[in-house]
Every structure is written in structure tokens, then in C-alpha cells.
Amino acid sequence: MYLAKVKGNIVSTQKNSSLKSHKLLLVRRIDLAGKYIGIKDEIALDLIDSGIGDIVLVAKEGAAVQQILGHKNAPVNTMIVANVDDLDIQED
């Protein structure tokens, strides 16, 4: 899993039946300070009603995502699993 920031919505009027009624969002990894890591955006399935600008926890592993969906053949491997309200990090 990793932290990411939601950068945008993806509108899809036709998609695989196991993905219907679920939002697709564009996310980019961030570090613990909230700074973007790299320039690569990813598409993530959203089940928790995240929005643009939200900091989220993303699972990127096909079997875990398919288990959450309850559908072992779902064509997805990246999913938003939590909205992050706060990070409390202890400095060494």
C-alpha cells in the first residue's frame, strides 16, 4: 500500500460489469510530507467516495483488490481503501 493524492476523475459510461457503480480516480503517489513522488499517475477504483485533493491509502495488488470486491476475475489491481485524515509521524 502507499499514500497518494487524488488528482482527477475518470468518466467511463461503459465498463466491465464488475466495475459498474464504482468511481475511477486518477491518483499520484506522495511521500510522508505530502510531496509528489515521480510524475506517473495511476487509475484507482474508489469504493469510499474520495474526491479531488484527498490524501488516500491505495492498495496495489490484484488478489487483495479482487478479495475486497468479492470478485476474483475483476480486471482491477489498484484501489483506494482509505481516506487519510491526518498523519502523525514521530521524528527520530
Language-model regions, residue ranges each:
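Conserved binding/recognition cores within well-folded domains
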Residues: 8
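Short aromatic-glycine-enriched beta-strand elements
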Residues: 18-27
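Short, structured beta-strand/loop micro-motifs enriched in basic residues and often containing a Trp
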Residues: 34-41
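C-terminal structural segments of small proteins and small subunits
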Residues: 57-59, 63-92
